[in-house]
């Protein structure tokens, strides 16, 4: 495999380890000085790798599920990945009470890879759909 394929495989493994709840794998896959340009809106997260671990612990408890890699493109040290995240809103997420309902959202993430580790992240999530599924925004009414 070439560097681009290795980088894409690294990102796929990252999501597989998230799905498995393997927090220890983050030490291998993510640089200590990891920079998240779009961190989750959770107050009090530490910077870097430690903040990423904190966020995953919170989301694993509240919204267990899986990530499906739909598409990937790699160029130089960047990997763009489109994912579909499916799960269940199982436990309260901060002040948002759990609905116990299904979650199904898409996101696009771009990672920069350096020396076999994720070093930077930029992302866009379908936040509107996510907020509807979390019960924060009312879902649209069905046909009349």
Kindly give the residue locations of the regions a language model identified.
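C-terminal and inter-domain tail/linker signature
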Residues: 1-144
